[in-house]
A protein has these predicted regions:
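Lipid interaction determinants
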Residues: 1-145
Length: 145
């Protein structure tokens, strides 16, 4: 079985945190973040993560929100898609980002270390600086269907 067939499918976010080297966790989209991740066997992916407590726009028009509504919603979600490749031997996935709500991600390759256990997929980022210390992003997904 190749790596793509192992992870292909639809996944629901269970938890998302940044774990700092001191062991403390930060929840960038709250402790009850929601998300969807889809991998196809053809090598495409789509990922969306967001806070559950984002404020609704008062007038119901997404193009007419107040600056505060727009800021809270933008800071409360991430969405990106593109192609991907899997290296099962070394335990990582590369997301080739084609488009993202955060334009600085576009054209980048995002490495994620993965562990697949039953119907759970854990993705971890390489270490990065967060608030002056090393941290790792940890996302736990559950396969749907």
């Amino acid at each position: 079985m190749n790596g793509k067939s192992q992870i292909a499918g639809a996944w629901k976010l269970i938890t998302f945190e940044f774990r700092k080297e001191d062991g403390n966790a930060i929840y960038p989209y709250g402790e009850k973040a929601q998300g969807s991740l889809i991998y196809t066997e053809a090598g495409r992916y789509s990922a969306q993560l967001m806070r559950v407590d984002r404020p609704k726009f008062a007038i119901g028009d997404q193009m007419q929100g107040t600056p505060e509504e727009i800021e809270a919603n933008y800071k409360g979600c991430v969405s990106y898609f593109g192609s991907y490749e899997v290296n099962p031997k070394n335990g990582y996935i590369i997301h080739h980002v084609e488009a993202s709500i955060f334009p600085n991600m576009e054209g980048t390759d995002q490495k994620r270390f993965f562990e697949l256990t039953g119907n759970r997929l854990q993705l971890k980022t390489p270490p990065f600086k967060l608030e002056g210390v090393k941290a790792v992003g940890i996302l736990l997904w559950e396969r749907l269907g």
